UniProtKB/Swiss-Prot annotation:
Main location: membrane
Presence of keyword Ion transport: no
Spans traversing the lipid bilayer: 7-27, 372-392
Protein name in UniProt: Uncharacterized transmembrane protein DDB_G0283675
Length: 392
């Protein structure tokens, strides 16, 4: 009997808990009134009206008076939409567009002919209905003439004025540029620009031109014009040593014979150059002495900046070592990595790793906190069933 009583008692408690959770909750008056604004009744669970903005539709369906300002009637819904920025009726309601079209039609009558006449001005026109035919009184012929003149007169003079001008402008233009005349004038013109344009092209190019046509336009690097009474062999003799001598002197200051000997010259050219140097031995010796003195001074000075550069390199190396570590202390301490930094990244050294681990912990705690409610409920149910099972 005790087992049956305990089972009955536990089952009653379990059913009572379920009824409490799934029973209809009692809502406060503020919540009920809030949902009634949107047309939803919490007690019955039904919608009282179709749209949530009935107060605006009632305002729009009211008949508008003609004395109302046109500006307010046109932009009234826009002003209302500012109060309710999430107003769906502002984009979906058709009454807004109907109001604007009606207001435009009421301001001034627009007729089929495209003539709009205001109501307050008496022009002498009687209009019974909106028809394309306009009845004009005979008392004021000036206005009637103004209506007839622009329709009849402009059409008549335009036709003869346009037609004769077109053939007159077209006919004389065709015979003037005859096809037979241009070929007679063009061949000399085509030959002359070619002769003038080709030297302009060769000035930019380095290739040697023919001395017959373009000698007075082309100039060598020395400033001598091409074809000025000199043969091609003599030009090569003068050009080649200068061009081979310049790039060698840029790197080496020593005036040795081996450096000055051009490699691409004939034997005759070498003999001529050697004879020229033998005649000028005195000048070359003086130049060589000066060059040697300069080279000695340079060599002496070359050693000094090397020492300074080493010192500068040492100075430059020191700030690089100080800039790399962020931890305050000696350089050796900064170079040796800490075991703490290797095993688990700290917040200072690697914020991404620390944040990731911290966020994982937060997520785990949040999931546990959110799951506590469900776990307690299910644990209570399981605990109750286990007790009942063992009691039976």
């Amino acid at each position: 009997m005790k087992l049956n009583n305990s089972f009955f008692f536990m089952s009653v408690i379990f059913v009572f808990l379920i009824i409490i959770q799934f029973s209809t909750a009692t809502y406060s008056k503020s919540e009920i009134e809030y949902y009634k604004r949107f047309g939803y009744n919490l007690e019955t669970g039904e919608y009282t009206r179709s749209s949530p903005h009935q107060h605006q539709q009632q305002y729009q369906q009211q008949p508008q008076s003609r004395q109302r300002n046109r500006h307010n009637s046109r932009y009234g819904s826009e002003r209302r939409s500012r109060q309710n920025p999430y107003n769906e009726d502002y984009y979906s309601n058709q009454n807004y567009y109907q109001q604007t079209s009606n207001d435009l039609d009421e301001t001034a009558p627009v007729y089929k002919q495209g003539v709009s006449i205001p109501k307050n001005i008496n022009v002498g026109i009687s209009i019974d209905e909106v028809t394309p035919n306009v009845i004009v009184e005979t008392n004021k012929p000036t206005f009637s003439q103004s209506l007839t003149k622009p329709t009849e007169k402009p059409t008549l003079p335009l036709k003869p004025s346009i037609e004769p001008t077109l053939p007159t402008t077209r006919k004389p233009v065709e015979p003037e540029p005859k096809k037979t005349l241009p070929p007679t004038t063009q061949p000399p013109e085509t030959i002359s620009p070619k002769s003038q344009t080709t030297p302009a092209i060769t000035q930019h190019q380095i290739s040697t031109p023919s001395p017959s046509q373009q000698s007075h336009h082309f100039f060598y690097g020395d400033g001598r014009p091409a074809g000025a009474g000199t043969d091609d062999k003599e030009e090569e003799e003068t050009k080649t040593p200068t061009r081979t001598h310049k790039p060698i002197n840029i790197d080496d200051d020593d005036d040795d014979d081996e450096t000055k000997k051009p490699t691409r010259l004939n034997n005759n050219d070498n003999n001529k150059n050697n004879n020229h140097r033998n005649n000028n031995n005195n000048k070359d010796d003086d130049d060589e002495d000066e060059d040697e003195d300069e080279n000695k001074n340079k060599n002496k000075n070359k050693g000094k900046p090397n020492i300074d550069d080493e010192d500068n390199d040492e100075d430059d190396d020191e700030p690089e070592e100080t800039e790399e570590p962020t931890i305050t202390g000696s350089i050796e301490e900064a170079k040796t990595p800490d075991p703490n930094l290797i095993e688990g990244y700290s917040s200072e050294s690697d914020p991404s790793g620390s944040q990731s681990t911290h966020e994982d912990n937060l997520i785990a705690t949040q999931s546990n906190s959110s799951g506590k409610i469900s776990i307690t409920f299910f644990s209570f149910i399981i605990f109750s069933f286990t007790i009942v099972f063992f009691l039976i």
